[in-house]
C-alpha cells in the first residue's frame, strides 16, 4: 500500500456519474476512455491539498483504482487527456500549476539555483522528495561544502613548505606527523588547504567502521586531532588507510582498496610509543 502522498493517478471502471472537485483536492483532471477490451472507464489525475492515504482516496472516489504518481506532473496530466482512447472529456477542475518536473536531476538544478532546502520540495515535488530525500540532503550538503571550501584562505607558514616538498615524492610506507604543541600554528588551516586543492579526505578521528565508510578512496588522507583526543587516537585505522586496504563493515561489509595512500596527521602531541615503527613516522615541526 502506498504511503500518504499528494499526487494520485486513478482509473474508475464503469462510472455511473461525473466527478467533481472535492474540497480536499487542489486539482482534478479526467476523461472517459474505452480500453482495448472495450471497457468504459474514467482515467484521471488528482493533486490533493495535503498528503492523503490510499484509504482516504478510496473514500473520495469509491470503486476507483489508485496509484501513487510515478512519472512527472506533466506526464500524469497528459496521460489523463490522451486522445487515442478518449470518448468524452477531458474535464479539468481547480488550477493546474506547473511546478518543477519530478526528476531528480531537475530538482537538483533547481536547488542549486534557488538555494532551497530539501524539505521545501515536499509540496512542489512530492514524489521526488518521497523517493530521494536522502539524495537531496546529500546534494545540498555538497553545495554547502563547495561554498565553504571556496571561501577558505591560507596564510602560509614556513613548515608548510616542508610538507609540500614531502608530497612531491611518493612514499608507500611513511606517515607524515605534523606536530605543533602550542596550537595556532596553522595546522587546521593547512589541512583545509589540502582539502581544497587536492581533494583530500579529512577526519578528526573516530571508530574504524565510521572512517572506513566515509573514506571514498581519496589518495590523500588527513587526520586533524584536537588536543582532547590524545587518549582516543585510533592508530589502527591510520595504519590500515596508509596500507591502502581497509574493511568497512558499516551498513554493508566491503573491503576498500587503493594502490597508494598518503597519510598526514596534524596534532598537538606525538604518537604514543610503540604504535608505529620509528622508521615509518616522518615528523614536521610546526
From Swiss-Prot:
PROSITE patterns: CRESS_DNA_REP (PS52020). Its cofactor is Mg(2+); Mn(2+). It comes from Faba bean necrotic yellows virus (isolate Syrian SV292-88) (FBNYV). Divalent metal cations, possibly Mg(2+) or Mn(2+). Residues 2-96 form the CRESS-DNA virus Rep endonuclease domain. There are 3 rolling circle replication (RCR) motifs. RCR-2 is probably involved in metal coordination. RCR-3 is required for phosphodiester bond cleavage for initiation of RCR. A motif (RCR-2) lies at residues 41-43. A divalent metal cation binds at residues 33, 41, 84. Homooligomer (Potential). Rep binds to repeated DNA motifs (iterons). Gene3D superfamilies: 3.40.1310.20. Its EC number is 2.7.7.-, 3.1.21.-, 3.6.1.-. This is Master replication protein. The active site is at 79 (for dna cleavage activity). A motif (RCR-3) lies at residues 79-82. It catalyses: ATP + H2O = ADP + phosphate + H(+). ATP binds at residues 186-188. The genome of nanoviruses is composed of six to eight segments. In addition, some isolates contain subviral DNAs. Belongs to the nanoviridea/circoviridae replication-associated protein family. A motif (Nuclear localization signal) lies at residues 50-70, 96-102. A motif (RCR-1) lies at residues 9-12. It is found in: Host nucleus. Keywords: ATP-binding, Covalent protein-DNA linkage, DNA replication, DNA-binding, Endonuclease, Helicase, Host nucleus, Hydrolase, Metal-binding, Multifunctional enzyme, Nuclease, Nucleotide-binding, Nucleotidyltransferase, Transferase. GO terms for molecular function: ATP binding; ATP hydrolysis activity; DNA binding; endonuclease activity; metal ion binding; nucleotidyltransferase activity; RNA binding; RNA helicase activity. Essential for the replication of all genomic viral ssDNA (trans-replication). The closed circular ssDNA genome is first converted to a superhelical dsDNA. Rep binds a specific hairpin at the genome origin of replication. Introduces an endonucleolytic nick within the conserved sequence 5'-A[GT]TATTAC-3' in the intergenic region of the genome, thereby initiating the rolling circle replication (RCR). Following cleavage, binds covalently to the 5'-phosphate of DNA as a tyrosyl ester. The cleavage gives rise to a free 3'-OH that serves as a primer for the cellular DNA polymerase. One of its GO terms (cellular component) is host cell nucleus.
